[in-house]
């Protein structure tokens, strides 16, 4: 009898301690998930892309959605459309009435909605694994830090997570009415962020081609289990999602905007995130680690859902071609971490090591955000603010600048030579033969402009003090 009581006590104590440890782990992981993105959003100041969106939102509220010509630069006759018009209006209203911090907190809230949606998605992939799924979200947060800016891509991430939840739920339950949500996401996405809208369709492709042509191969290899579900409803949802995208202020022009932009060869030269990741860059390291995890997980589990293979493989290829596409690879990569691994089978030493790595990587993300803010963005902002202090009538002043400072100068009211919207200055987009030559001959222009700045320093100072009509600025 006494032995039974002792045994019950030991079992109860072990169960209680295990429960206590789970609670502590849950609290710590949730704290990291909440705190790290918040710190990054608050530390990072509004960047050049957001400044031009605020400027655009202010313009739309005053003048409407259809300017006759591009209104912010010194160039004439360039056609122009507001490709993120709804985000521009939303951002401007929040900034105008609630301030900069409120805009950051709003987008932080959108990102946390994405994190919550990802948690629900991971629960579909790995049930009864709360600690593991929370740890996976911490890893995802650390990798996503470089994309946490006050930009409309926060909405895109949220919509993609919701889309995958809908598709996964449909695969398991075969309830076709769930797919109605995806065309709605497509319609809202093209209003908020039309320049990346096709990613909604791309995420559907693995579910559309899950089996069809590969049934025999699947059965022969016995490593790719196939779920039986109807593909036709997904095809119909795909067609509907593409069709509703035309419902926007600029019609078909917004639908094909990304395709037209990618045909501009100068973009890769001018925008680093459009180029393929450098071999020794952080992005290349993340891609390599993701591939190693995939190969190791597949070798250990010996099977994978075919749609996961297509989704991860396709987005990995995208991330290899363009650095900014890596964020779209991280979402399926998180799903694969939940699919392949089981933390319950990992030793306590490995768990402790993993927890330490999570903490270090998370706080390193905050440090990187702080370093980037203090060494670059603030310098550009301060330089533009200095001009604004000395120029009482910026709307009558033309500034011959380089790209990065252009958007903030335009927000302040100056007319600029160039800004960060590289594609706008190409005749493939603006339908003007008089488009800005800077974005076609950038290296030559950089050299000549810097030479002019150095040789005419005294003349510029004299002109700045007396005329205040034309200003050269170079923050490189």
Model-derived features with residue positions:
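Transmembrane-helix motifs of polytopic, lipid-linked glycan transferases
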Residues: 105-126
């Amino acid at each position: 009898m006494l032995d039974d009581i002792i045994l019950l006590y030991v079992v109860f104590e072990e169960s209680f301690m295990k429960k206590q440890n789970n609670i502590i782990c849950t609290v710590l992981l949730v704290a990291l998930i909440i705190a790290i993105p918040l710190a990054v959003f608050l530390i990072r100041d509004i960047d050049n892309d957001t400044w031009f969106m605020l400027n655009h939102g202010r313009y739309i509220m005053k003048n409407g959605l259809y300017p006759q010509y591009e209104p912010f630069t010194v160039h004439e006759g360039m056609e122009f459309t507001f490709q993120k018009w709804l985000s521009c209006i939303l951002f401007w209203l929040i900034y105008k009435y609630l301030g900069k911090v409120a805009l950051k907190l709003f987008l932080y809230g959108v990102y946390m909605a994405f994190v919550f949606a990802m948690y629900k998605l991971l629960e579909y992939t790995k049930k009864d694994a709360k600690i593991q799924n929370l740890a996976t979200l911490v890893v995802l947060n650390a990798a996503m830090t470089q994309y946490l800016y006050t930009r409309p891509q926060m909405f895109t991430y949220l919509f993609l997570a919701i889309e995958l939840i809908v598709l996964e739920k449909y695969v398991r339950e075969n309830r076709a009415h769930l797919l109605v949500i995806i065309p709605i996401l497509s319609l809202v996405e093209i209003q908020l962020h039309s320049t990346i809208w096709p990613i909604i369709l791309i995420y559907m492709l693995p579910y559309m081609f899950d089996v069809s042509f590969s049934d025999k191969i699947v059965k022969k290899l016995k490593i790719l289990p196939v779920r039986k579900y109807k593909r036709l409803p997904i095809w119909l949802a795909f067609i509907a999602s593409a069709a509703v995208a035309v419902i926007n202020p600029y019609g078909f022009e917004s639908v094909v905007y990304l395709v037209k932009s990618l045909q501009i060869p100068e973009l890769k030269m001018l925008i680093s995130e459009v180029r393929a990741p450098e071999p020794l860059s952080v992005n290349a390291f993340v891609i390599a680690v993701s591939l190693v995890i995939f190969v190791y997980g597949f070798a250990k589990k010996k099977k994978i859902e075919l749609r996961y293979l297509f989704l991860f493989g396709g987005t990995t290829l995208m991330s290899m071609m363009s650095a900014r596409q890596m964020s779209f690879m991280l979402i399926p990569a998180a799903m694969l971490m939940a699919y392949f691994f089981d933390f319950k089978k990992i030793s306590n030493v490995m768990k402790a090591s993993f927890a330490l790595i999570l903490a270090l990587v998370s706080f390193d993300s905050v440090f990187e955000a702080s370093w980037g803010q203090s060494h670059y963005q603030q310098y550009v902002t301060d330089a533009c603010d200095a001009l604004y202090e000395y120029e009482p009538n910026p709307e009558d002043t033309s500034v011959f600048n380089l790209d990065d400072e252009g958007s903030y100068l335009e927000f302040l009211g100056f007319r600029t030579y160039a800004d960060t919207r590289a594609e706008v200055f190409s005749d493939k987009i603006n339908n003007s033969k008089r488009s800005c030559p800077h974005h076609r001959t950038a290296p030559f222009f950089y050299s000549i402009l810097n030479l002019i700045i150095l040789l005419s320093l005294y003349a510029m100072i004299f002109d700045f003090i007396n005329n205040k009509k034309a200003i050269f600025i170079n923050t490189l």
